[in-house]
Amino acid sequence: MSTKFNVKTFQGMILALQEYWANVGCTIVQPFDMEVGAGTSHPMTALRALGPEPMAFAYVQPSRRPTDGRYGENPNRLQHYYQFQVVIKPSPDNIQELYLGSLKMLGFDPTQHDIRFVEDNWENPTLGAWGLGWEVWLNGMEVTQFTYFQQVGGLECKPVTGEVTYGLERLAMYIQGVDSVYDLVYSDGPLGKTTYGDVFHQNEVEQSTYNFEYADVDFLFKAFEQYEKEAQELLALEKPLPLPAYERVLKAAHSFNMLDARKAISVTERQRYILRIRALTKGVAEAYYASREALGFPGCNK
């Protein structure tokens, strides 16, 4: 399958992936509008992976990892970057073939390129999630993570959800043959050429400065406590509200990540904070599952 989009631009590559997975049958949803560390934290993955209701979603997700910032000086380390996420439940038997089809569409002939699936089981302690997985290496560079979810929020995933996560910047750097993410051609149209650096370099410099030097530590500690308290209250209601509670959990997790960037948390404290977030996520997962069960798992009736 070919595409009408120019995959030699970052923009065109994303549009091509959206087109490809839409044709497979995925619903293309929009990025989650809060700070998350990975596409997995989007509710369409983290919560929809629970319970028996089938799903098929694909989306771009901006991801923030404050400790990964390098003041815009490192050619491939960013505190804000993009993932393309595909989640299908139950995971189709041919999901690897579908993935390889997406690489072909981007111009990679599997007979001409070294494409390897390297076993790499995945775990997210704060989500209480883990899965069997593989890294996909393209000519020696990791470009994708494959995961078959086994648990989220400590609950078993039945049936198993298949997740494909593309590292968009890495994949684009390979396609375009550049050594610095800032040299990527983001778009190239009638109004001229725009690079990734044009769009994001100043943001990397300033956000790194904020994350490491100026984020208010006292405020972040208080914010964590407040978000934790709100999440607990929402889950303790007679009719719990798992979706708003989950948003509070994500806010708490981002506050923790910012404290980590500020080096405000010791190694032992760090583990305690992770366990606190994990406990909240477990509560959200149980409440979400119960809410769908109370509705009779309506997605199963389609």
From Swiss-Prot:
Subcellular location: Cytoplasm
Keyword Protein biosynthesis: yes
Any one annotated GO CC term: cytosol
Catalytic activity: tRNA(Gly) + glycine + ATP = glycyl-tRNA(Gly) + AMP + diphosphate
Enzyme class: ligase
UniProt keyword annotations, A-Z: Aminoacyl-tRNA synthetase, ATP-binding, Cytoplasm, Ligase, Nucleotide-binding, Protein biosynthesis
EC number: 6.1.1.14
Top-level taxon: Bacteria
TM ranges: none
PROSITE patterns membership: AA_TRNA_LIGASE_II_GLYAB
One Gene Ontology molecular-function label: glycine-tRNA ligase activity
GO annotation (BP), single: glycyl-tRNA aminoacylation
PANTHER family reported in the protein's UniProt record: GLYCINE--TRNA LIGASE, CHLOROPLASTIC_MITOCHONDRIAL 2, GLYCYL-TRNA SYNTHETASE
Subunit structure, interactors included: Tetramer of two alpha and two beta subunits.
UniProt record similarity statement: Belongs to the class-II aminoacyl-tRNA synthetase family.
NCBIfam families noted in UniProt: glyQ, PRK09348.1
Protein name: Glycine--tRNA ligase alpha subunit
Organism: Haemophilus ducreyi (strain 35000HP / ATCC 700724)
Gene: glyQ
